[in-house]
Amino acid sequence: MSSFQLPKLSYDYDELEPHIDSNTLSIHHGKHHATYVNNLNATLENYTELHNKSLEELLCNLDTLPKEIVTAVRNNGGGHYCHSLFWEVMSPRGGGEPNGDVAKVIDYYFNTFDNLKDQLSKAAISRFGSGYGWLVLDGEELSVMSTPNQDTPLQEGKIPLLVIDVWEHAYYLKYQNRRPEFVTNWWHTVNWDQVNEKYLQAIQSQKH
């Protein structure tokens, strides 16, 4: 049986305070994300030919899946992927400015880090309804985009490096309707070491 797992966080639920409150984080990870994982496993249970597929393989090839499970995999697989990356790129010791190779590439494509912050913040804040704001590697270029619902940049052939979740369950208990305030404060949690590592891995994968 296909058995995707809810990832363990590298920090406790209260360690992203005050930017993300422990109540929100515990529900977001332990309830919302867990539901996506459980639903994805249930969807794939009877499709043994898919049990050896990675999450990325499933999401990059939705058009090859049996039609009756495409929507469920898109939503639940996407939910699992988006949340897993969201947790990875945050840290109690986050914030500050980018470092390593990704810092140089950000300066090249956005001129300054502040320009990236402005563009990604606007993409996240202006996303109508639920979705995500992303920094992605598109070929050799960095760009900003947003996606609705649980859609991922993988479906457009782009490699995600950084993501912010702007579904209401990501912030509503603390920020209510103040999405811009949540987005501003989220920058204090960004784990730039992890983003740089994602960038290096993405560049390496394109060479194979």
From Swiss-Prot:
Provide an example Pfam family for this protein. Answer: Sod_Fe_N
Question: What catalytic reaction does the record list?
Answer: 2 superoxide + 2 H(+) = H2O2 + O2
Summarize where Mn(2+) binds, as residue positions: 28, 83, 165, 169
Provide this UniProt record's keywords sorted from A to Z: Manganese, Metal-binding, Oxidoreductase
- The kind of enzyme this is, by top-level EC class, is oxidoreductase
Q: Which Gene3D superfamilies match?
A: Fe,Mn superoxide dismutase (SOD) domain, Iron/manganese superoxide dismutase, C-terminal domain
Q: How does the cofactor attach, per the note?
A: Binds 1 Mn(2+) ion per subunit.
Q: Which GO terms describe its molecular function?
A: metal ion binding; superoxide dismutase activity
- InterPro entries attached to this UniProt entry: Mn/Fe_SOD (IPR001189), Mn/Fe_SOD_BS (IPR019833), Mn/Fe_SOD_C (IPR019832), Mn/Fe_SOD_N (IPR019831), Mn/Fe_SOD_N_sf (IPR036324), SOD_C_sf (IPR036314)
The UniProt entry's sequence similarity note says: Belongs to the iron/manganese superoxide dismutase family.
Name-wise, this protein is Superoxide dismutase [Mn] 2
Q: Which organism is it from?
A: Bacillus cereus (strain ATCC 14579 / DSM 31 / CCUG 7414 / JCM 2152 / NBRC 15305 / NCIMB 9373 / NCTC 2599 / NRRL B-3711)
Mind giving the lineage of the organism this protein is from?
Answer: Bacteria, Bacillati, Bacillota, Bacilli, Bacillales
Gene name in the database record: sodA2
